[in-house]
Amino acid sequence: QDKPFWSPPIYPV
C-alpha cells in the first residue's frame, strides 16, 4: 500500500 506523499515545491524567495 503506497502512502500518499505530497510535497509542495517551496523555493527560497
Curated annotation (Swiss-Prot):
GO cellular component: extracellular region
Keywords associated with the record: Amphibian defense peptide, Pyrrolidone carboxylic acid, Secreted
Entry-linked InterPro entries: Tryptophillin
Segments forming a coiled coil: none
Pfam families to which the protein is assigned, alphabetical: Tryp_FSAP
Compartments where found: Secreted
Name listed for the protein in its UniProt record: Tryptophyllin-T3-1
Organism: Phasmahyla jandaia
